[in-house]
Amino acid sequence: MRGVFVTGTDTDVGKTMVSAWLAQHWRADYWKPIQTGSTEGTDFESVARLAPAARIHPSAVVLPAPLSPHEAARREKTRIDLSSLVPPVTDRPLVVEGAGGIMVPINEVALMIDLMERLSLPAVVVARSGLGTINHTLMTLEMLRRRRVPLLGVVMNGQKNPANRQAIEHFGGVRVLAEIQPLPAVTAATIAGLPPPTFTCPGDP
């Protein structure tokens, strides 16, 4: 399967924007296996709006509360089964977006990193560019490597910070794939106006 798993060092670091950017420029399919906080709108709706070239697949699990998947499911008196999270079949690149960071619980025994390990797609880690990002990013990279999740690289989101980029590349032994500076507004036009990725979608067609 040709694709990437877009994860982040935290929630609200820009995973959906980066997913839309990749999906638009690669003309890819987009799938978010678990969507929480659906009462506030869904990320697949956002990507459909931001990346008109993308083909959107519905989430396998949609939960109303804006909480971690395990807690959002508990409040609905249900349980998320990892085996039910099966990627869509497609002949296009697939951009998969996680919920929260890699250690967020999916149920009482499984974490997001377990799903990443199961899917075995190369990870794109979205990180903030500012203070605190070195620690969060290096810990995320360390856990991904411990679990042998393939790692494509890091996308930094925010004002450029050369010192933080250098530290992440040096200590993390990873490539910073892109630096996306703050946009005046996040729209289909501004996403399309971003420079295209300088890296190709990995995997077999």
UniProtKB/Swiss-Prot annotation:
UniProt keyword annotation of Nuclease present: no
Gene Ontology CC terms, in alphabetical order: cytoplasm
Needed cofactors: Mg(2+)
Binding site residues for ATP: E97, G98, A99, G100
Native species: Paramagnetospirillum magneticum (strain ATCC 700264 / AMB-1)
Disulphide connectivity of cysteines: none
Protein name: ATP-dependent dethiobiotin synthetase BioD
Binding site for Mg(2+): T16, E97
Organism ancestry: Bacteria, Pseudomonadati, Pseudomonadota, Alphaproteobacteria, Rhodospirillales
Domain of life per record: Bacteria
Subunit structure comment from the entry: Homodimer.
PANTHER family linked to this entry: DETHIOBIOTIN SYNTHETASE (PTHR43210:SF5)
Keywords: ATP-binding, Biotin biosynthesis, Cytoplasm, Ligase, Magnesium, Metal-binding, Nucleotide-binding
Residues annotated for substrate binding in this entry: T36
Predominant place of localization: cytoplasm
GO biological process, one term: biotin biosynthetic process
Active-site residues, as the UniProt record annotates them: K32
EC numbers, comma separated: 6.3.3.3
Protein family: Belongs to the dethiobiotin synthetase family.
